[in-house]
Amino acid sequence: MLEKQSVNQKEQYNFNKLQKRLRRNVGQAIADFNMIEEGDRVMVCLSGGKDSYTMLDILQSLQKSAPINFSLIAVNLDQKQPGFPEDILPAYLDKQGVEYKIVEENTYGIVKEIIPEGKTTCSLCSRLRRGILYRTATELGATKIALGHHRDDILQTLFLNMFYGGKLKGMPPKLMSDDGKHIVIRPLAYCREKDIERFAVAREYPIIPCNLCGSQPNLQRQVIKDMLRDWDKQYPGRIETMFSAMQNVVPSHLNDHKLFDFKSITHDSDIIDGGDLAFDREALPLNPVGWQPEDDEDTEKRPPVRLDVLEIK
């Protein structure tokens, strides 16, 4: 009995620490990018996945202690996927006491009709969803649209653009929407996916899978995701260092002449951003920048995180 109590206490301690870390990361991102302001009405896009559930949960928690007043409204787009459990999200949101709206649009049928079997559906599906969500934000009077992309999504996008698009371009934490009418924010920008996974398991969210995304195992994004996860296992701290690099860009030491005016450098110019060692090899830190091992994380002993996903028939 005492042993069981001890285990429960340790689990609660670890959960509290995890929740505090997520709150801290979300709060820091909101502050760094001025994501939420006094009087904002934030439309939280809720897909039924672990990321959007966690985003709504943490935003609700921060709302209670924030020095500013803002409101939240959860929005789910019912894309009419066969077997989609329409009762799950309303029941969950009613229980949480969250204002919400379910938008019904048959984007699933449109995508299936237009995209040939075996081809990637993400681009069209995303474009359709985006237009519907922008329209809904206008109807609801939302001043911000919150999406559930996290730190790992941002890094994956960076590598996708480098490997396939020839660009150093990631996923911005805050941006103006395509139609020029809405501000889109990503409050989970500083949050690790593995933290979100553990939090979702502890919270026992009713996870709803996507029949479109989940049926495409060879997507380029999945390949990048697997690569980064392998790096994280083999070289602890590498992911944190790469994300730190995205926050410490030095345009004068890249090769984009549109971003930095190399032509203006003359013998009279000052040393820019520390100059360059030119003939000497730069000394690099022994430990990864931006990484600190979590004292509650014993990755060798902890079993893999498994989310309970609802079965769609």
From Swiss-Prot:
Protein's cellular compartments: Cytoplasm
Q: What else is known?
A: The thiolation reaction likely consists of two steps: a first activation step by ATP to form an adenylated intermediate of the target base of tRNA, and a second nucleophilic substitution step of the sulfur (S) atom supplied by the hydrosulfide attached to the Fe-S cluster.
The protein in question is named: tRNA-cytidine(32) 2-sulfurtransferase
Query: Ranges of Basic and acidic residues compositional bias?
Result: 299-313
Q: Where does [4Fe-4S] cluster bind?
A: C122, C125, C213
- What reaction is this protein's catalytic activity? cytidine(32) in tRNA + S-sulfanyl-L-cysteinyl-[cysteine desulfurase] + AH2 + ATP = 2-thiocytidine(32) in tRNA + L-cysteinyl-[cysteine desulfurase] + A + AMP + diphosphate + H(+)
Q: Which pathway does UniProt place it in? A: tRNA modification
Q: Which UniProt keywords apply?
A: 4Fe-4S, ATP-binding, Cytoplasm, Iron, Iron-sulfur, Magnesium, Metal-binding, Nucleotide-binding, RNA-binding, Transferase, tRNA processing, tRNA-binding
To which species is this protein native? Yersinia pestis
User: Which is a Gene Ontology cellular component entry for this protein?
Assistant: cytosol
Assembly and interaction partners: Homodimer.
EC number assigned by the record: 2.8.1.-
User: SUPFAM superfamilies from the entry?
Assistant: Adenine nucleotide alpha hydrolases-like
Please name the GO terms of the biological process aspect recorded for this protein, alphabetically.
tRNA thio-modification
- Single GO molecular function: 4 iron, 4 sulfur cluster binding
